[in-house]
Structure formats: C-alpha cells, structure tokens
Amino acid sequence: MNFDRQNLTDDTLVDLYKRILKPRLIEEKMLILIRQGKVSKWFSGIGQEAISVGVTAVLDQDEYILPMHRNLGVFTGRNIPLYRLFSQWQGKANGFTKGRDRSFHFGTQQYKIIGMISHLGPQLGIADGIALANKLKKNGKVTAVFTGEGATSEGDFHEALNIASVWELPVLFVIENNGYGLSTPTNEQYRCENLADKGIGYGMESHIVDGNNILEVYNLLSDLKASMKINPRPVLLEFKTFRMRGHEEASGTKYVPQELMDQWAIKDPVENYRKYLKANGVLTEDFDEA
C-alpha cells in the first residue's frame, strides 16, 4: 500500500492513527460482547474504517454527516462519549433511542449526525435538503452522506444525484463499495466497471479512491472540502474496500470465496497504516504499546 503524507505534519499523522485505531478496538470488544450475549447484534465495519474516519476528520464539527450501519468511525470521530454509545448498543434507557433500538438507527443534533435509514437510499435525498439550506444561507458548509454499492441500484440514488447536480448542492456522496450487498456480489448488482462512472450521466465530478488508505482518503477530502467552499457542487466518491465480516455477525461469510478474503486481509487499513508510521519513525514502539 502506497501512503503519501504530502504536507501533513507528524502530529496529524499520529492523530489519524488514533482516530482509526479507536473504532477498531471498540469493534473487537463488540465481537466479544455479542458472543457473551451482552449485545444482540452487530454490523461490523472492520476493514472499512479509513473511509468514515477520514471523511469525519476533514469535516467541521458543525457540518452534517449521514452515516450507515458500519460507520462507527463517524461516531467516534465526533467524540460522542463511549458510555452513551455502549448504552445505545445494549438497549439501555440512557441510549440515544432509550432502548428502542440497539444499533446505529439514531441521530444526534448535538453532534450533527442524522440517523441512518435502513435501506440507505432515502438518506441521500435528506442530505440534499441539508445542503440546499446551507447553500441558501451561503455559509460554505459541506454535507457528507454515506451509502453502499447496493443502494446505488435504488431509485433514491438517481433522484438525489440528479437534483444535487442540477442545483449544484455541496454534497459529498460517499459510496462504500465493499464487494457485497447482503450476500450479493457486485457483478450481480450492476454492469458498469466503476460506480464513479455514474457521475458522468449527472454531469457530476467523481473520484475512485482506495478506501483502505487513510491518507489517500484524508488528503483527497481535504482538497475537495476547500474547493467546494469556493465552488459549491456535489461530488461522487467511490471508495473501494471490502467487508471482512458478515452482513451482520449472525450471517457469517460462507458465501465469500476464501481467496477473496485473503486478498483483502493483507490490505487491512489499520495494520498497514501502523506499519507505515513505524517505518517512517512517526510512531514509536512505546507509543504503540501504550
């Protein structure tokens, strides 16, 4: 994996490492808790952390994000207290949904996060509405909305991108292409080689990004955010990554070829970034062990 720090300081590189490590450590704990029966379900984002972490790190704290069920890095990136998050996942009364849900179906105005909609497509249109309000206010704010490659087959995807393009709304449409929609591989979902190519039909700028490379994510998003403040517009981003766990923990990954799992395992976003920082003297052994 090729990491390009560009003009990032050592402090920024270490901060990004802390940001990407935090959701990974939480996820590893959650996998234990689900087997102990202390949580009832879990939608893992292991292997996809660089995307949500990188996007959230670039946006201002008062800019809205509309995440999915695998975007733990959005919630940790906004520094939501862990006791509130764990209360939510365990269905406790002091969780965000007061025990009515034990997953990521919640939002919080305090942290400018809009709760996910299960089939994902509809939240793209909501992002358009937020972006329209920002454009009318001329405040230079950007809105980021996450979706999966499966949801790009929904009608909501077309409607949201079409109106965003026509009205030049400042929206970052983030597609996490992780190879599978539930148990359906991408070659059974669509015929185009890259989903980013769909941007052409809307006259929309689009990019293909290595979703496992935290620096590539962060650097591109930093440039786009600065540019969109001057020239408000929508941008379609296809992040290539892979779902290393089941759709949710109970479903497993038996339908995924083992060679594909092995191929992506060596592209782990956390481990590869750690190795890069150590090799370049940015991360010391003492710091990493701590």
Regions found by a protein language model. Give the residues of each.
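Cofactor-binding active-site loop characterized by glycine-rich and histidine/acidic residues
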Residues: 28, 32, 37-167, 185-191, ...
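N-proximal short alpha-helices
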Residues: 3, 24, 96-100, 237, ...
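Conserved acidic/glycine
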Residues: 1-51, 57-58, 250-290
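Glycine-rich ThDP/TPP pyrophosphate-binding loop and its adjacent helix/strand module
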Residues: 113-290
